[in-house]
């Protein structure tokens, strides 16, 4: 087959298949399977005795090649360590070293939740099977809290422990004076406690007031000594009695 034009002197032997090319291709790439058209397409563009290639590519499309899977480069027994460590004794994947935690025996194991009561002396929980049930949270105090251990002490129920704790409302009902927010209700003034006069003292003071509305210092001392009162109490009583009399005189209608 000849090509006219500028490349008239060159021949394209794309149709002619060379057995030597097929042999070399099969020996170089044993895993790749080529068809007859692919070998013809590979031979396209080669001219006899020159490095000049055809400017026009072959119009036929290249067929898909089927590749066989190659074996892995490293086998499963390969290890990144040196050979003197022994590849057979180490696993394929390296795991970090974790120190083993000491697990106590079943006799010395002591399981305790933060809801439990404090241990009483040297009491120890015995007879349990080692299985602990899930406990509800503190928000569900109304529900039943199951016993965590079969040999738990009957008096160490978490509900009873919770009831032993002092509550704010119950504490206020018992002693409200201890609460700082209720101190203003029971605040004590700096004044002395009011002591009312007896009937005898009131009667004698009324007699003295009718005799004289104002007492001298000496007379006030005598009245206070006779009635077993202080001079200040006698003075205050006379002041209050005068104010009462003045108020009564204002309330009376004028004729």
UniProtKB/Swiss-Prot annotation:
Q: Where's DNA bound on this chain? A: 190-249
Does Oxidoreductase count among this protein's keywords?
no
The record's region (Disordered) falls at: 35-66
Q: Transmembrane region positions?
A: none
For this record, an example GO cellular component is: nucleus
Which GO annotations describe the biological process of this protein?
anterior/posterior pattern specification; DNA-templated transcription; embryonic skeletal system morphogenesis; proximal/distal pattern formation
* Keywords assigned by UniProt, alphabetized: Developmental protein, DNA-binding, Homeobox, Nucleus, Transcription, Transcription regulation
Name the SMART domains on file.
HOX (SM00389)
Its predominant location is nucleus
Q: Where does it reside?
A: Nucleus
Q: Which Pfam families is this protein grouped with?
A: Homeodomain, Hox9_act
What molecular function does GO assign, one term? RNA polymerase II cis-regulatory region sequence-specific DNA binding
Q: What does this gene product do?
A: Sequence-specific transcription factor which is part of a developmental regulatory system that provides cells with specific positional identities on the anterior-posterior axis.
Report the sequence similarity comment from the record.
Answer: Belongs to the Abd-B homeobox family.
Q: What is this protein called?
A: Homeobox protein Hox-B9a
Species this protein is from = Takifugu rubripes (Japanese pufferfish)
- List the taxonomic lineage: Eukaryota, Metazoa, Chordata, Craniata, Vertebrata
Record gene name: hoxb9a
